[in-house]
């Protein structure tokens, strides 16, 4: 059976908060970014964290945030991170705190991501 996960060496961890509820999303390096699913956040947003690479080598990271609309998810942010990444063993902040506002009443999605286990 094919698995897109290649290693647990590099770990991307994102804390995503909507309406006072926080979800912790942990992402491992994958070979194929198209196999990574989006995660429903409170029925209002979708969040997708993609880390492409192999083992502790990370080629790139892409983060996507979508507003869930009646017709289809609407992209409200795409963030792209390219090497070099810090190579420390404790988690390193990648994004800082991001606050996104979307929809007719300006709903707020908050997230921050850290990265650990990356090799040069």
Predicted regions and their residues:
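Cysteine-centric segments in proteins
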Residues: 9-120
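N-terminal signal peptide c-region/cleavage motif recognized by signal peptidases
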Residues: 3-5
């Amino acid at each position: 059976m094919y698995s897109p996960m290649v290693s647990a060496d590099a770990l991307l961890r994102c804390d995503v908060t909507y309406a006072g509820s926080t979800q912790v999303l942990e992402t491992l390096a994958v070979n194929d970014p198209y196999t990574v699913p989006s995660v429903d956040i409170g029925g209002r947003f979708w969040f997708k964290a993609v880390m492409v690479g192999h083992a502790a080598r990370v080629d790139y990271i892409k983060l996507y945030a979508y507003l869930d609309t009646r017709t289809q998810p609407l992209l409200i942010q795409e963030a792209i991170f390219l090497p070099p990444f810090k190579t420390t063993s404790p988690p390193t902040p990648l994004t800082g705190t991001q606050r996104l506002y979307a929809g007719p009443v300006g709903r707020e999605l908050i997230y921050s991501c850290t990265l650990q286990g990356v090799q040069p």
